[in-house]
Amino acid sequence: MTESAGSAVVAGIRDLLPVLRERAQETEDARDVPAESVKAIEETGFFRLLQPTRFGGLEAEPLTFLSAVRLIASACGSTGWVASVLGVHAWQLALFPPTAQEEVWAGDAAVRASSSYAPTGRAEAVAGGHRLTGRWSFSSGCNRATWVLLGAIAAEGEGRPVDFRTFLLPASDYVIDDVWDTVGLRGTGSNDIVVDGAFVPEHRSLSFADVFRCRCPGHEVNTEPLYRLPYGSLFSYSITTPIIGMATGAYDAHVAYQRERVRAAYIGQKAAEDPHGQVRIAEAAGELDLAWLAVERNMTELMELARAGEKIRIPLRLRVRRDQVRGTGQAIRAVDLLFENSGGRALKTGTPIQRFWRDAHAGRVHAINDPERALSAFGRGEFGLEVPPDAML
């Protein structure tokens, strides 16, 4: 991809921000991202950023993708979240066997997939593939997708667990159960996916063991450095970056509000002249800068190694996860500082500060943001101890 193509996508997203900001309450009320918003984002080329060029994609730098995600989330947290998870799935689809990629993209390069990775369903091995049954929750953006990626423990006929796999299913093989009703990220439409005995051919499943080793069937045709990145490094930042964006949106809204605010409780003091408020703003800005600088450092270093054909080793993968969970924490601390400094009017329904605050905290509880798990794994690595599989590297 040329640098100008990625820059054009980011510029297109920047132009969309006023519209996405204006639709933020509508998105929350609908409990789903409006189709018009997804279409507008699609027209910028955003969903093609991580898609292989052989299927009309741009194969952009991960940092370009994450920069666009941060912008979208700074206008509407729910829209940024959905855009990020749908967008990163194009990268994961490129790891599947070539036959699966052809099946998904050959007819329509604009296809999108949602996901739910927790292995809450059952996959039974049958001739030529697996039979999938169960219910999967938290499939963000599923109403704006026509495929889904579902996690399950693949078992032999007698039920013996053999592998944790991701299964790829078309919309005709599942039902969406509209159950999403939450206090945060309300507009993500993260509904349940219900599957009843769908047959999934072997070429539409991907072993997490292969993903962890960065040796996937899709590498046969997608040889570019982008697809050599560790799944845990890119996917984890696709969850943290929207939260950084939400906190950035809260920061922008807060500064604009404080610039004009007069604090009646302090005898008409201008909020902008309050030294205590100034300190909170400085601290919030510092947290956001630290979080984003780590994104830039890690994505740049990962891509440099991938381009050089070098193996991305466990110590770096541990550091990326360490920085990623800390980045989430830094964004949460920033949005908390801003919310606390906003006064009672920020509690009113419809104000952007409270929406960003709720959305950021909702994103924080995603499994990939468990700080103790990631930080403990980093500490174990520093002492040369075995790193547990749940470190999600």
Regions found by a protein language model. Give the residues of each.
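Generic structural signal for well-ordered, non-transmembrane alpha-helical segments
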Residues: 245, 282, 286-289, 321, ...
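Glycine-rich flavin
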Residues: 33-43, 47-145, 160-162
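DPxDG-like acidic metal-binding loop motif
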Residues: 135-174, 178-179
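Glycine-rich phosphate/cofactor-binding loops in nucleotide/flavin-utilizing enzymes
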Residues: 342-393
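Basic/polar N-terminal segments that are highly enriched at the extreme N-terminus
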Residues: 1-15, 391-393
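Glycine-rich beta->alpha junctions and the first turn(s) of the following alpha-helix
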Residues: 184, 190-288
